[in-house]
Amino acid sequence: MSFEINWQDLGEDEAVNDSIKSFLNSHLQSISLPSYVSSLQVTDFCLGGIPPNITLREISDPLDEFYNHIEKEELPKDKIPEESDSGCQSADGENGDLLPEVQAESDLQFLVEVDYKGDMRIGVSAELALNYPSPSFMTLPVKLSITDLGIHALCLVAYISKQLFVSFLCDVADPILDARESLIDLGSSAILGKKSLERISLIRSIKIDSEIGEQNNVEGSVLRSVGKLEQFLLEVFRTILKKEAAWPSWINLDFNEDPSGNESSDED
């Protein structure tokens, strides 16, 4: 079974694009930049008009972890059970799950296969710092365009009490993306290379094009720094997506009357 998504409306929604741009910038501000970069900011984000292909693989009851998350959100802070030395949650000295007393009939969980090779675009601005003969001796503006994002993975989508949970589980074999994962473009763009030994990479393919300011005065050391910046961005965006959306983390969308916004939860 396949799904059709009105992706065009999402891609043209400025609020959605601005929200994702703000989300990415908040993460960029929280990371330590390498010495050759003095600033880094997402200046533009467009979801694009090409939707992912989504195939339904299984329908089941939602996982206990999602119910536990909802109950912990609803409990007062002084009532949240502490974790025992073994890592399991306990209440009144006993281990146990925080399952709801009543599970609604409308609660559902879908295991879906997500295949995305769309036209999403991310614009990034940065300043390369030349640290010789002194730190930040000179800075050079750089504009980067991120395109050709490729994802093919299994994903859990759970609906509980007007809340939506989305978590990616593992990569799926893909002839196109598997071929791209073994490539590195040494020209003006970079392709994410080296197959990950982990169960999930999520971002299997990504391309970055760079535009350097004052190109007539560019030195070899600057060009090398641009290449390092491109590779740094590849790892940053892959890490952000894995940290926020790959199991045991998830994206939580609350559609109740008093929504708390987009949240992600880490469950160790």
UniProtKB/Swiss-Prot annotation:
It is a peripheral membrane protein. One of its GO terms (biological process) is mitochondrial genome maintenance. GO terms for molecular function: lipid binding. The keyword Glycosyltransferase does not apply. It is found in: Mitochondrion outer membrane; Endoplasmic reticulum membrane. Residues 1-256 form the SMP-LTD domain. Residues 75-94 are annotated as: Disordered. Keywords: Endoplasmic reticulum, Lipid transport, Lipid-binding, Membrane, Mitochondrion, Mitochondrion outer membrane, Transport. It holds the Pfam family MMM1. It comes from the Eukaryota. PROSITE patterns: SMP (PS51847). Component of the ERMES/MDM complex, which serves as a molecular tether to connect the endoplasmic reticulum (ER) and mitochondria. Components of this complex are involved in the control of mitochondrial shape and protein biogenesis, and function in nonvesicular lipid trafficking between the ER and mitochondria. MDM12 is required for the interaction of the ER-resident membrane protein MMM1 and the outer mitochondrial membrane-resident beta-barrel protein MDM10. The SMP-LTD domain is a barrel-like domain that can bind various types of glycerophospholipids in its interior and mediate their transfer between two adjacent bilayers. Belongs to the MDM12 family. Component of the ER-mitochondria encounter structure (ERMES) or MDM complex, composed of MMM1, MDM10, MDM12 and MDM34. A MMM1 homodimer associates with one molecule of MDM12 on each side in a pairwise head-to-tail manner, and the SMP-LTD domains of MMM1 and MDM12 generate a continuous hydrophobic tunnel for phospholipid trafficking. HAMAP family: Mdm12 (MF_03104). This is Mitochondrial distribution and morphology protein 12. It comes from Lachancea thermotolerans (strain ATCC 56472 / CBS 6340 / NRRL Y-8284) (Yeast). The gene is MDM12.
